[in-house]
Curated annotation (Swiss-Prot):
Catalytic residues (UniProt): H108 (proton donor)
Name recorded for this polypeptide: Oxygen-dependent coproporphyrinogen-III oxidase
Important for dimerization (site feature) positions: H177
Subunit and interaction comment: Homodimer.
InterPro entries linked: Coprogen_oxidase_aer, Coprogen_oxidase_aer_sf, Coprogen_oxidase_CS
Annotated binding of substrate, by residue: S94, N110, V111, R112, G260, G261, R262
Biological source species: Erwinia tasmaniensis (strain DSM 17950 / CFBP 7177 / CIP 109463 / NCPPB 4357 / Et1/99)
EC number: 1.3.3.3
One term of GO molecular function: metal ion binding
Length: 302
């Protein structure tokens, strides 16, 4: 079947949210997700889940949303002007994980489906998503594992898929005002529809299911490492870059706010604690300097 099946996508996304939350609870070993179901006045709603003050995760949020409306927001029509005048539905699962231990990276993943329709015209639809990793202290084996998992899940869909979406991720998660990468990248894709609904949906499923395979082994490797005030201060400083990107550059944040989405859920990606420091410079040859020099730069990890 190559006509879009919104109900099938929704079933997958709800199950994916359940699976990821269960695996994160197992990895944390103490805290549980609290669920908050909500309705959007303009149409649709969602299921927000947040885990706080766990043994491993300071905060983890895993959101499902399914929103619809009669008119496209400016953030979408600017990107695709042919969508003006169409009604829309947008479904997705989005997650951000902020560990307490600075040696465990922050991670983000998102998978989504979008369809816009108007009478007398074919629907315009696509899939998007990806996952990316933001370490504070870099470990080459973690970066290689992260990218190897991404490569492996892409390979059944074509040898060109990983390099294309790896580059797109590097380009997207770039803080232009700092001329810095947000992290070590991963995968980012959008506007995916060229191979038909079934094939595009299969790829989105592979990315959604691949996230835990990419992230949780890193959590297990790093969660027992001891850390102190120095590492925590640097983690909180680097979290500031996460905030800057999400509020200034992220298309998903802008889309959510412009469509009247639920602000608490949209800003769930924000770290619970963060700090800024004027003109911070890491000490030369320190682990902090190595992050800038060796990790948050565009490079081939495989």
């Amino acid at each position: 079947m190559n006509t879009p099946d919104i109900a099938q996508v929704k079933r997958f996304l709800l199950n994916l949210q359940d699976e990821i939350c269960q695996k994160l609870e197992q990895a944390d070993g103490a805290a549980r997700f609290a669920e908050d179901s909500w309705q959007r006045p303009g149409g649709g709603g969602g299921r927000s889940r947040v885990l706080r003050q766990g043994r491993v995760f300071e905060q983890a949020g895993v959101n499902f949303s399914h929103v619809h409306g009669d008119e496209m927001p400016a953030s979408a029509t600017a990107h695709r002007p042919e969508l003006a005048g169409r009604s829309f539905e947008a479904l997705g699962v989005s997650l951000v994980i902020h560990p307490e231990n600075p040696y465990i990276p922050t991670s983000h993943a998102n998978v989504r489906f979008f369809i816009a329709e108007k009478p007398g015209a074919d629907p315009v639809w696509w899939f998007g998503g990806g996952f990316d990793l933001t370490p504070f202290y870099g470990f080459t084996e973690d970066a290689v594992h992260w990218h190897q998992t991404a490569f492996d899940l892409c390979l059944p869909f074509g040898a060109e898929v990983y390099p294309r979406y790896k580059k797109w991720c590097d380009d997207y998660f770039h803080l232009k005002h700092r001329n810095e990468q947000r992290g070590i990248g991963g995968l980012f894709f959008d506007d995916l529809n060229a191979h038909g609904f079934d094939q595009s949906f299969r790829f989105m499923q592979a990315v959604g299911r691949g996230f835990c395979d990419a992230y949780l082994p890193i959590v297990e490797r790093r969660k027992a490492l001891t850390w102190g005030e120095r590492e925590r201060d640097f983690q909180l400083y680097r979290r500031g870059r996460y905030v800057e990107f999400n509020l200034v550059w992220d298309r998903g944040t802008l889309f959510g706010l412009q469509t009247g989405g639920r602000t608490e859920s949209i800003l769930m990606s924000m770290p619970p604690l963060v700090r800024w420091e004027y003109d911070y410079q890491p000490r030369e040859d320190s682990p902090e300097a190595a992050l800038y020099r060796d990790f948050i730069v565009v490079k081939e990890w495989l």
